[in-house]
Regions:
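A conserved beta-strand-loop-helix scaffold within acyl/acetyltransferase catalytic domains
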Residues: 38-69, 75, 83-92, 207-255
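Short amphipathic alpha-helix that is part of the acyltransferase structural core
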Residues: 2-58, 180-215, 244
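Catalytic cores of nucleotide-enabled group-transfer and carboxylate-activating enzymes in metabolic
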Residues: 23-24, 35, 46-61, 65-78, ...
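Acyl-donor-binding surface of acyltransferase catalytic domains
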Residues: 1-13, 87-183
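A common structural microfeature
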Residues: 30, 68-70, 80-82, 97-101
Length: 255
């Protein structure tokens, strides 16, 4: 049965023999999250993070309520996995999109934790939709790399199908070709007083793209506080006088 807590509707916790589950409690859980993520640092498509990064990310979170939308898995009282449901309004489909993230300790992958957690993520998303957005369109969504074949099999068996494919591409920095700019366009850095203009131009440029959303103010605050991605000294901004004509927001992951 679902339960009510602090005006939230809570889906029942996952159940899996040999493991215990609980919801997120407080920032004291952040270090466990870092340890779980970093156990996979040598895997393909790895994520690199730190306690500072996690703290900054969760300081401005709005797409989730951690106490409602996050669950940890434990074995022998040790945290070995966590997951979080999130939601955003998607203009292009006129729907609430319920996505999720999940990190499982490298040593505990393939033990059934992923499937148990995905089931809970879907249940909690349904609770959130019925409580907050009843009557509106809603759908489950997830981005997965092809290297995560087990998770792909799980979601396919649960009725998901691929709607879009993305490619990660890389090249070295040698012999980068030069292309002349159109007349009247100049490239220069953005000043601190123009960071909001850069953000707004970026959001506007993507409104016609597949899966476009309108980010809340908290995402701007998260963006300017995350030094792994917010590195304006590396940006290449094309200006048409005062308006922004285009941009490449370069960054070097410092973690």
């Amino acid at each position: 049965m679902e339960s009510q807590n602090n005006n939230y509707t809570l889906a029942p916790l996952p159940r899996l023999a040999g493991f215990n589950f609980r919801r997120f409690e407080d920032p004291g859980d952040y270090q466990a999250m870092v340890d779980i993520i970093m156990s996979n640092v040598d895997d393909p498509n790895n994520t690199v993070t730190s306690l500072k990064d996690i703290t900054a990310d969760y300081a401005n979170i709005t797409e989730s309520v951690p106490a409602r939308d996050m669950v940890f898995a434990f074995h022998a009282e040790q945290p070995i996995a966590y997951c979080r449901s999130a939601s955003q309004w998607e203009e292009s489909s006129n729907s609430w999109i319920y996505g999720w993230l999940m990190h499982v300790h490298h040593d505990w992958k393939g033990r059934g934790i992923e499937e148990a957690m995905i089931g809970w993520l879907e249940d909690q998303a349904v609770c959130n939709h019925q409580t907050l957005h009843a009557g509106a369109n809603g759908m489950h969504s997830v981005f997965l790399p092809e290297s995560e074949q087990e998770r792909l099999n799980i979601v396919i068996n649960r009725g998901y199908s691929a709607s879009r494919h993305f490619e990660n591409m890389k090249r070295d920095l040698a012999e980068i070709p030069e292309h002349p700019l159109p007349e009247g366009i100049t490239v220069r850095l953005a000043m601190p007083s123009q960071y909001r203009q850069v953000w707004d131009a970026n959001v506007e440029a993507f409104q016609d793209h597949w899966g476009a959303t309108i980010p809340p103010e908290s995402e701007y605050q998260e963006w300017i506080s995350n030094k792994n991605y917010f590195q304006p000294y590396l940006w290449q901004i094309a200006w048409d006088g005062d308006p922004i004509a285009g941009m490449v927001l370069n960054f070097i992951n410092l973690t």
